């Protein structure tokens, strides 16, 4: 599984002119599921995201997690994180999970974050979404359960 994690002061997702998920201070997490991913990948990613220390402590050092600051998480599915642009100029998405598997593991990831006590909002799986955010920092982190980066 891959994720782009952004520290935000606020974020929201709009589908067909309706806000389907919104948060204040916390993390916006774009999540892509690969064709070979398993629940173990979900567990690794949920643990990493929930414990990622990218919020500043009283000394201004990035030392606090989203849970430490009582922040919120907005999770948005994004299969395009598996876009392969090494050949040509049109991305190939053959490494992305098929929709049924992608949805199941995306929902498992959200469930695991909630089990960790986090307040989680979501986008809408397979919908065309407009994501509005205020990136705080900016701080943007890339995660990959295969540890490619």
Curated annotation (Swiss-Prot):
Domain of life assignment: Bacteria
Compartment(s): Cytoplasm
Keywords: Cytoplasm, Hydrolase, RNA-binding, tRNA-binding
Any single GO CC term annotated in Swiss-Prot or TrEMBL for this entry: cytoplasm
InterPro entries: Daa-tRNA_deacyls_DTD, DTD-like_sf
Enzyme class: hydrolase
Gene Ontology terms, MF aspect: D-tyrosyl-tRNA(Tyr) deacylase activity; Gly-tRNA(Ala) deacylase activity; Ser(Gly)-tRNA(Ala) hydrolase activity; tRNA binding
Reactions performed catalytically: glycyl-tRNA(Ala) + H2O = tRNA(Ala) + glycine + H(+); a D-aminoacyl-tRNA + H2O = a tRNA + a D-alpha-amino acid + H(+)
Residue ranges annotated as motif Gly-cisPro motif, important for rejection of L-amino acids: 137-138
Membrane-spanning ranges: none
EC number: 3.1.1.96
PANTHER family xref list: D-AMINOACYL-TRNA DEACYLASE 1 (PTHR10472:SF5), D-TYROSYL-TRNA TYR DEACYLASE (PTHR10472)
Biological role: An aminoacyl-tRNA editing enzyme that deacylates mischarged D-aminoacyl-tRNAs. Also deacylates mischarged glycyl-tRNA(Ala), protecting cells against glycine mischarging by AlaRS. Acts via tRNA-based rather than protein-based catalysis; rejects L-amino acids rather than detecting D-amino acids in the active site. By recycling D-aminoacyl-tRNA to D-amino acids and free tRNA molecules, this enzyme counteracts the toxicity associated with the formation of D-aminoacyl-tRNA entities in vivo and helps enforce protein L-homochirality.
Similarity field: Belongs to the DTD family.
NCBIfam families given in the database record: D-aminoacyl-tRNA deacylase
UniProt free text on domains: A Gly-cisPro motif from one monomer fits into the active site of the other monomer to allow specific chiral rejection of L-amino acids.
Name of protein: D-aminoacyl-tRNA deacylase
Naturally occurring in which organism (per UniProt): Thermotoga sp. (strain RQ2)
Species lineage: Bacteria, Thermotogati, Thermotogota, Thermotogae, Thermotogales
Name of encoding gene: dtd
């Amino acid at each position: 599984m891959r994720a782009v994690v952004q520290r935000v002061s606020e974020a929201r997702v709009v589908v067909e002119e309706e806000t389907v998920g919104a948060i204040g201070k916390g993390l916006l997490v774009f999540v892509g599921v690969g064709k070979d991913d398993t629940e173990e990948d979900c567990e690794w990613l949920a643990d990493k995201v929930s414990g990622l220390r990218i919020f500043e402590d009283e000394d201004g050092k990035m030392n606090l997690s989203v849970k430490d600051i009582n922040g919120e998480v907005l999770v948005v599915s994004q299969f395009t994180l598996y876009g392969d642009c090494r050949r040509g100029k049109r991305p190939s998405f053959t490494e992305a999970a098929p929709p049924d598997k992608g949805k199941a593991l995306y929902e498992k990831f959200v469930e695991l974050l909630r089990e960790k006590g986090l307040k989680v909002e979501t986008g809408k799986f397979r919908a065309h979404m407009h994501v509005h955010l205020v990136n705080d920092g900016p701080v943007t982190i890339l995660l990959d359960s295969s540890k490619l980066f």
